[in-house]
């Protein structure tokens, strides 16, 4: 009997990881399928966009130094990503191959139960079968976050590292302000002392306060390792007195759009 996507995800025995990946895939799939233009796009085009956006976050695990992330966690991540994407009608040959290799590695390490071992061929067959996009878009999930006002957070985008301060939480989204610093290695709280706030240059040539409601930043710690807590209980964020003010309090975005905006 064929195995279902949810059955595979349950066999991974990693509820938190699966929840995070499934939520990210559904968020990206929803946005890619919204609007009148989406109906004119080929499923393969939508799939390419979704996979690229999802991997912007989860490559922090898939491409991590083995000394920093346990190999079995990487394998579970690869398999969960492939299954969640396939469930929404998307597939990537390279990720599918990584997921199949993960099945072999997880079995070799006896990391999961006998049912996973017995159904391994069925899981591979599922992943290599044509992915069919569901007729209905994924629902918009209710916003929530485990991050708190006063948290200072490191953020990885490709091979660069940024940091921001959570000013407050509003309607399930952290309101964040970035420190004006970026470097190729992870930041530490000590490196942020005296660093001013990063501004946004507008058409008038002036630098303005740049704050964002960052939806999709939910889990703490972050299972994707893209966001890391550097400090907590920090009442004062980066100094922004050098920046001009405008009428808006903050811009609404999410972790994927913000990540794209920060790409080198």
PLM-predicted stretches and their roles:
Residues 197-264:
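Long, low-complexity intrinsically disordered regions
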């Amino acid at each position: 009997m064929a195995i279902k996507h949810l059955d595979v995800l349950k066999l991974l025995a990693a509820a938190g990881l699966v929840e995070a990946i499934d939520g990210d895939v559904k968020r990206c799939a929803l946005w890619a399928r919204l609007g009148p233009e989406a109906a004119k796009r080929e499923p393969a085009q939508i799939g390419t966009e979704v996979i690229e956006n999802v991997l912007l976050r989860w490559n922090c695990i898939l491409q991590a130094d083995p000394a920093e992330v346990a190999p079995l966690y990487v394998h579970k991540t690869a398999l969960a990503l492939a299954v969640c994407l396939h469930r929404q009608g998307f597939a990537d040959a390279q990720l599918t191959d990584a997921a199949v290799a993960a099945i072999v590695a997880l079995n070799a390490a006896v990391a999961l139960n006998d049912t996973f071992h017995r159904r391994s061929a069925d899981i591979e067959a599922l992943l290599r079968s044509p992915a069919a996009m569901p007729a209905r878009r994924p629902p918009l999930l209710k916003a929530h976050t485990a991050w708190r006002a006063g948290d200072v957070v490191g953020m990885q985008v490709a091979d660069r590292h940024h940091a921001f301060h959570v000013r407050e939480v509003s309607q399930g989204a952290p309101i964040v302000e970035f420190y004006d610093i970026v470097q190729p290695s992870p930041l530490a709280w000590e490196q942020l002392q005296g660093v001013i706030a990063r501004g946004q240059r507008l058409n008038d040539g002036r630098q303005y306060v740049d704050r964002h409601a960052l939806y999709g930043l939910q889990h703490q710690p972050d299972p994707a390792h893209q966001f890391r807590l550097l400090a907590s209980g920090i009442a004062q964020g980066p100094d922004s007195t050098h920046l001009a003010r405008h009428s808006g309090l903050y811009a609404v975005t999410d972790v994927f759009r913000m990540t794209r905006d920060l790409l080198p």
